[in-house]
Curated annotation (Swiss-Prot):
The gene is folE2. It comes from Methylibium petroleiphilum (strain ATCC BAA-1232 / LMG 22953 / PM1). Converts GTP to 7,8-dihydroneopterin triphosphate. Keywords: Hydrolase. Transmembrane segments: none annotated. Its EC number is 3.5.4.16. It comes from the Bacteria. This is GTP cyclohydrolase FolE2. The lineage of its organism: Bacteria, Pseudomonadati, Pseudomonadota, Betaproteobacteria, Burkholderiales. One of its GO terms (biological process) is tetrahydrofolate biosynthetic process.
């Protein structure tokens, strides 16, 4: 068989997923998940390469049998190959590109990945990287517009106020995780970018801010670290260990204190809309964790 004849046969392969469906059931979300693909994220002023676990989906009308599954990966490959750094503004734009490629009016992108921030120890100033978990989530729904969320998981140190109060010396302390999921809002009056296909902007302020004032991972990390008994570092010298031990002892926090203090910082930032903050203490005197959650809708 010649290449030309093989090409001719390919052109007549039926496209089953594009057929009409008669069951009259729309699908809210259909797509691919747990797709590992490289990307570049913007952390402050730095561009950081990483590998993300992607979940991509669109809404499917009742009359359409299936979506274009291969186009999700095609879109993702093009994004990765472009080298474009992913921040909130870029994510919003890329969601519109994905929806157009799949001929969809609603859809969602979620990318979860590790990232690093270089930190300097509090006394010695020695430099090292600390790893965090981050996520970008963007969703467009007809009638409510586009929302973009930034999520971080920040490791910190907490020390128990009760243990300090009742003990002659020392107090139990542990590593804690602060998880912040924040909706990024754009400034009032900024309406320069058109909505993705399907329209339907909400009467609420559309999420995502201009790049000059955009809030990202580094700011959310600082909200968590500044609220803890002490932040932590990847590399420390003895004077640094002394400083952290004494800093935590002088700044005890219950899990309730920590989650409230983080929430207060989020409340004070006009760039943040809805949010969810969860703190988990990996209790050093128990074989279980303590946790607290605050949500703003």
């Amino acid at each position: 068989m010649t290449h030309a004849s093989a090409l001719g046969l390919t052109q007549h392969i039926p496209d089953t997923q594009s057929e009409r469906d008669e069951r009259h059931l729309a699908i809210q979300r259909v797509g691919v998940k747990e797709v590992r693909y490289p990307l570049t994220v913007r952390i402050g002023e730095q561009l950081s390469p990483t590998v993300a676990s992607w979940s991509l989906d669109v809404a499917l009308p009742a009359e359409q049998k299936g979506t274009h599954m291969s186009r999700f990966v095609a879109w993702l490959d093009a994004l990765s190959a472009s080298g474009k750094p992913l921040d909130a503004t870029a994510l919003r734009d890329e969601l519109a590109v994905m929806l157009d490629k799949l001929h969809a009016v609603e859809g969602r992108i979620e990318a979860r990945f590790p990232f690093f921030i270089r930190k300097h120890a509090p006394v010695s100033g020695v430099s090292s990287l600390l790893d965090y978990q981050g996520a970008w989530i963007a969703e467009h729904r007809a009638g409510s517009g586009t929302t973009v969320w930034c999520e971080v998981v920040v490791p910190v140190k907490s020390l128990c106020p009760c243990s300090k109060e009742i003990s002659d010396y020392g107090a139990h302390n542990q590593r804690s995780h602060v998880t912040i999921r924040a909706e990024l809002m754009e400034p009032p009056g900024d309406r320069r970018r058109p909505p993705p296909p399907g329209g339907g902007e909400s009467t609420r302020e559309r999420p995502v801010v201009d790049s000059a004032v955009e809030l990202g991972f580094e700011a959310l990390v600082r909200f968590a670290e500044a609220s803890a008994s002490s932040e932590i570092w990847g590399l420390l010298k003895r004077p640094d260990e002394k400083w952290i031990t004494e800093r935590a002892y002088e700044n005890p926090k219950f899990v309730e204190d920590l989650v409230r203090d983080v929430a207060l910082r989020l409340n004070a930032d006009a760039r943040i809309g809805r949010y969810r903050v969860e703190v988990e203490n990996f209790e050093s005197i128990h074989n279980h964790s303590a946790f607290a959650v605050i949500e703003r809708e």
